[in-house]
UniProtKB/Swiss-Prot annotation:
Membrane topology classification: Multi-pass membrane protein
Main localisation: membrane
UniProt-recorded name of the protein: Putative ion-transport protein YfeO
Alphabetical list of InterPro entries matching this protein: Chloride_channel_YfeO, Cl-channel_core, ClC, ClC-type_chloride_channel
Transmembrane segments: 10-30, 54-74, 99-119, 120-140, 149-169, 186-206, 223-243, 258-278, 300-320, 322-342, 343-363, 386-406
An example molecular function term from Gene Ontology annotations: monoatomic ion channel activity
UniProt entry tagged with the keyword Nucleotide-binding: no
GO cellular component: plasma membrane
Organism: Escherichia fergusonii (strain ATCC 35469 / DSM 13698 / CCUG 18766 / IAM 14443 / JCM 21226 / LMG 7866 / NBRC 102419 / NCTC 12128 / CDC 0568-73)
Top-level taxonomy: Bacteria, Pseudomonadati, Pseudomonadota, Gammaproteobacteria, Enterobacterales
């Protein structure tokens, strides 16, 4: 016979597995549709028209039209494509299900059109809303927070292809009760995360790891080098943190979302022309291209880091529906490669991983997620002790500093009140 604690944990096991699978399938379908549309917009259509896909005209035109299209969705769809991600944390309160179709369409358009945001925030919003709405009907005795946690865990597992990230994140958020052991509280979320990760793995494997030279033995000087790299990344990230609310307020002086996002898309197009196509889109595939291209110099990496960070701020400030983690990882990789090119004595594994740790820490203010992303992109067990040590001064630097999020306006724009 099972102990009552075990029976309690098993109660949510089946819903947890179902939510994890559903979270992954939603992500897979959205990404597949976005990929097909991206191929149409950036390969087939310019080829048919006899235009180079990397021509300045095409980049500016597609991103401007993407902004206008997303603006139309936000203006006229029911629920206005959900809340503004710039004003929301990664895991937020459930939104009305009526807002989800518009949010999904806005996300697909942004991903396919080359906007420098990832899918994580909208997908999280969709999965939480569906889990809460359906779960409340099927099992009304389970509170909304439980459904939110399961959907969040399933989505994190699906996004990163492993339940490890969910375990790290929820180990700090669920450890609030001394009466219930932590692993009792983690059981159902980890079931959801594992189901999400395994389902994603059946269709595709997220490629986070980069072909960077293996790091051998840790030296004391490497700790100092890593701390300096993380501090540089944090400084760059804090510039973006300072710019985001100010640019957000400036862009939202334009009350019409179609015009506002059209202007935002035009600016993104100009930034894309400056840095080239590798600076577009969410950044995961593009950082693989960046590492594979041996022709990039220190100045090229610097330009890519600055432009991608600027594009991230512009996209978020303009109201595009997307997340900030994936493009931030791209910025970290570009910064790390730049610093390695500038000081070759410092291994690329250190510069890249510590730059990712610093910039993701600025964006998420989550130490576990920052460590996970750094270790996922540069998978080397020798680096783990170094990253844990470097995290300490990085966390001190950010203590009490503002986060990369805009305070919600006291009065929403007219198109958000409809």
């Amino acid at each position: 016979m099972l102990h009552p604690r075990a029976r309690t944990m098993l109660l949510l096991s089946l819903p947890a597995v179902a939510i994890g699978i559903a979270s992954s399938l939603i992500l897979i379908v959205v990404m597949k549709i976005a990929s097909v549309l991206q191929t149409l917009l950036w390969q087939r259509l310019p080829g048919t028209l006899g235009i180079a896909q990397d021509s300045p005209f095409w980049i500016i035109a597609i991103l401007t039209l993407t902004g206008i299209a997303v603006g139309l969705v936000i203006r006229f769809s029911q629920g206005h494509a959900g809340p503004d991600p710039a004003c929301e944390p990664l895991i937020g309160a459930p939104v009305p299900p009526s807002a989800l179709p518009g949010l999904i369409v806005a996300l697909i358009l942004g991903l396919a059109g080359g906007v420098s945001l990832g899918p994580e925030h909208p997908i999280m919003t969709v999965n939480i809303a569906l889990a809460v709405a359906i779960g409340a009907r099927l099992l009304p005795r389970v509170n909304r927070m439980e459904w939110t946690i399961l959907a969040s865990a399933g989505t994190i597992g699906a996004l990163f292809g492993t339940p490890v990230a969910a375990a790290l994140i929820f180990s700090q958020t669920l450890n609030g009760s001394s009466e219930v052991p932590l692993w009792d509280r983690l059981f159902a979320p980890l079931m959801a995360a594992a189901a999400g990760a395994l389902t994603t793995g059946l269709f595709f494997h997220p490629h986070f790891s980069l072909p960077i030279a293996h790091y051998g033995q840790m030296e004391m000087t490497d700790i100092l080098s890593g701390a300096i790299v993380a501090a540089i990344a944090i400084a760059a990230g804090m510039v973006a943190v300072w710019c985001l609310p100010r640019l957000h307020a400036m862009m939202h002086q334009i009350k019409n979302p179609v015009l506002m996002l059209g202007v935002g898309g035009f600016i993104l197009g100009i930034l894309g022309v400056i840095a080239g196509p590798v600076s577009l889109f969410k950044g995961l595939d593009e950082m693989q291209q960046m590492v594979a291209n041996q022709a990039f110099s220190t100045s090229d990496y610097f330009l890519l880091a600055v432009i991608k960070l600027a594009a991230l701020v512009v996209a978020a400030a303009s109201g595009f529906r997307g997340g900030r983690i994936f493009p931030a990882v791209f910025v970290g990789v570009a910064l790390g490669l730049m610093l390695h090119e500038h000081v070759p004595a410092v291994p690329a594994a250190i510069t890249v991983s510590c730059a990712i740790l610093g910039i993701v820490l600025v964006v998420t203010r989550d130490g576990w997620l920052s460590l996970f992303m750094a270790a996922a992109v540069v998978p080397n067990t020798t680096l783990l002790p170094l990253l844990c040590i470097v995290m300490l001064p990085a966390w001190l630097l950010l203590a009490g500093k503002p986060i990369m999020m805009v305070n919600r306006p006291k009065q929403q724009p007219p198109h958000d009140n409809v």
